[in-house]
């Protein structure tokens, strides 16, 4: 469902006519070699497209106009090979709507000590050309990612590739919509939010449809399609064959087929459900939701569209990478002193992309929702480094709260727990991490990912110009409290 190859990134090289045609030709040749080398590296998720060397204000403005109008262009990478006076860039940068990465590099890795002359010095001027360019971004208060180092370095390429994945997620969010079936769970605060502001800042179009529309589609699903889907279930999961289980599984298969059809029709990238509004649905969607998350859709329970959008964004960022991403909830604690852990789960809807082993389809009663016993996938989560992230509406801005965590083995069986689960240790430790999370107002609903790290989410928040706070091994609680206070002042003073 998610294809990062559909996007491209425009590589913009700055110079000026002052240097003459011979120098400008060398600039173009060297830029072409850099871009060809980058495109040969499989680390990059999308194609990088070299554009003609930019030498005047009109050329710069025109290229940004074209980038804005091209839905395939997910972002722009800028590099000043020579000195490119930044007043020429003001008009173009002022209209730019695409994420921007400023690559501070130069063609040659080393100084040619024995042969360096003024011709070399005139050609290789990024050391001061990119400083000039950095000033105009700072002066215009523009969001951008800055990557410094030689273009052949592994670390430089890794940072560019991460940012490209983030930019793809931003473009994806601007092109689709989040479908809500029903409203938010009654009386819950943290799942609420300003949907207009979300579309302005995050690009997410969030709209609601009555669950009755979905229920009618479920009833109309052909039995042939159900049987085909059951065959797929048997291949991918451990599936029971008793009559009680099969009846429930068939209902989830119908919900999955109808949901997928509806989401495709609405060009949706994510969706929400709520157990308080099920209308004529036979069950609360469980297995169906897990399967659609596995395909790449974002999801939020109880109407939590912010969680749904964030899950989708991270799934786009992590496409093709090891690990997975899921909707998650901090459910209960293991509070042995010195080994405090969080058990993450939800009633039904945990994505199998984070499964450690082959998931099992199980059918169990569900005490809420008032419907038949739902089928769901049950499994233990993957182990290793992970992130837990929540986006909340603070009234005058969105805040992204990110916690670095370590997913640990679940060493004891939980035979009576009928849901998928993951066990993690928050960084730097349970008490400080949880204190910081609560101080920041992080939600109980999160996006949990073993596919990405914190840098992706920082890049995402900075590109979208929303607040973020990070809880990791470097946390100092007193400094964190000050950061929250300073952020309150900064975001209160900041104009849109």
Curated annotation (Swiss-Prot):
Cellular component terms (Gene Ontology): cytosol
Pathway: Carbohydrate degradation; L-arabinose degradation via L-ribulose; D-xylulose 5-phosphate from L-arabinose (bacterial route): step 1/3
Cofactors named for this entry: Mn(2+)
Leader peptide range in chain numbering: none
Name of protein: L-arabinose isomerase
Cofactor: binding details: Binds 1 Mn(2+) ion per subunit.
Disulfide bonds: none
Transmembrane segments annotated in the record for this chain: none
Function: Catalyzes the conversion of L-arabinose to L-ribulose.
Family, similarity comment: Belongs to the arabinose isomerase family.
Residues annotated as binding Mn(2+): 302, 329, 346, 445
Cited InterPro entries: Ara_Isoase_C, AraA_central, AraA_N, AraA_N_sf, Fuc/Ara_isomerase_C, Fucose_isomerase_N/cen_sf, Lara_isomerase
GO biological process, one term: L-arabinose catabolic process to xylulose 5-phosphate
Catalyzed reactions per annotation: beta-L-arabinopyranose = L-ribulose
Keywords, alphabetical: Arabinose catabolism, Carbohydrate metabolism, Isomerase, Manganese, Metal-binding
One Pfam family this sequence matches: AraA_N
PANTHER family associated with the record: L-ARABINOSE ISOMERASE
Record lineage: Bacteria, Thermotogati, Thermotogota, Thermotogae, Thermotogales
SUPFAM superfamilies: FucI/AraA C-terminal domain-like, FucI/AraA N-terminal and middle domains
Gene Ontology MF, one: manganese ion binding
């Amino acid at each position: 469902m998610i294809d990062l190859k559909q996007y491209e990134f425009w590589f913009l090289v700055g110079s000026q006519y002052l240097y003459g045609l011979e120098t400008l030709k060398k600039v173009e040749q060297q830029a072409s070699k850099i871009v060809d080398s980058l495109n040969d590296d499989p680390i990059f998720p999308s194609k990088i497209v070299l554009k003609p060397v930019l030498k005047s204000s009109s050329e710069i403005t025109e290229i940004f106009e074209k980038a804005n109008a091209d839905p395939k262009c997910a972002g722009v990478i800028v590099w000043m090979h020579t000195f490119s006076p930044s007043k020429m860039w003001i008009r173009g940068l002022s209209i730019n709507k695409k994420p921007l990465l400023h690559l501070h590099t130069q063609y040659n890795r080393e100084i040619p000590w024995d042969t360096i002359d003024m011709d070399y010095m005139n050609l290789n001027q990024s050391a001061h050309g990119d400083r000039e360019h950095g000033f105009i971004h700072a002066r215009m208060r523009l969001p951008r990612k800055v990557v410094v180092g030689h273009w052949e370095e592994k670390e430089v390429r890794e940072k560019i590739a991460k940012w490209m994945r983030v930019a793809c997620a931003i473009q994806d969010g601007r092109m689709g919509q989040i479908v809500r079936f029903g409203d938010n769970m009654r009386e819950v605060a943290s799942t609420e939010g300003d949907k207009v502001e979300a579309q302005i800042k995050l690009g997410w179009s969030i709209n609601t449809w009555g669950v009755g529309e979905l229920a009618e589609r479920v009833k109309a699903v052909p039995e042939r399609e159900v049987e085909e889907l059951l065959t797929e279930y048997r291949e991918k999961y451990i599936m029971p064959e008793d009559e009680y289980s099969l009846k429930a599984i068939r209902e989830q298969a119908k919900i999955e087929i109808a949901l997928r059809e509806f989401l495709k029709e609405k060009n949706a990238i994510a969706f929400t459900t709520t157990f308080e509004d099920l209308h004529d649905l036979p069950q609360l969607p469980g297995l169906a939701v897990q399967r659609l998350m596995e395909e790449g859709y974002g999801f939020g329970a109880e109407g939590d569209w912010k969680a749904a959008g964030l899950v989708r964004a991270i799934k786009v960022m992590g496409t093709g990478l090891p690990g997975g991403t899921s909707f998650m909830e901090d459910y209960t604690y293991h509070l042995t002193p010195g080994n405090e852990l969080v058990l993450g789960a939800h009633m039904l809807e945990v994505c199998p992309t984070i499964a450690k082993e082959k998931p099992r389809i199980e059918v169990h009663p569900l005490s809420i929702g008032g419907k038949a016993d739902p089928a769901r996938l049950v499994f233990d989560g993957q182990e290793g480094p992970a992130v837990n992230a929540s986006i909340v509406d603070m009234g005058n801005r969105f805040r992204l709260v990110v916690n670095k965590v370590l997913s640990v083995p679940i060493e004891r069986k939980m035979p009576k727990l009928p849901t998928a689960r993951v066990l993690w240790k928050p960084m730097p430790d349970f008490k400080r991490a949880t204190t910081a999370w609560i101080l920041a107002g992080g939600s109980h609903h999160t996006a949990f990912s073993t596919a990405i790290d914190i840098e992706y989410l920082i890049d995402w928040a900075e590109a979208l110009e929303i607040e973020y706070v990070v809880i990791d091994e470097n946390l100092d609680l007193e400094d964190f409290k000050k950061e929250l206070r300073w952020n309150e002042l900064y975001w209160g003073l900041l104009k849109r």
